[in-house]
Amino acid sequence: MDLSLAENPMVWVVVRTEGGAEQFVGQQHTDLDITFIPFFAEKEAAQDGLHRLKREKGRRYEVQAVRFRELARDAARHGFLLFHTAADGHILNKIDPHTVA
């Protein structure tokens, strides 16, 4: 799927629920000291990608849709990059959320 981020589409992310609060699931690349939130263009890709993410045992994870700009605002506020990711874990695009209008 070709994803036009300028149109503020719905994208799919993995969300963790803890104590009734939902939180986007971020990942960390320790060698490069990068923290990022993977997002997917399609629900099926996110469901497949969920199993490739590092997760904590005993936590509840699910795939949810969110507007791209809302995700970008939250990522910028918490110091994360955004990685448009394929179902197989391949990174399609790296985005600095501070550059999103």
Predicted regions and their residues:
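Conserved NAD+-utilizing ADP-ribose enzyme module
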Residues: 1-101
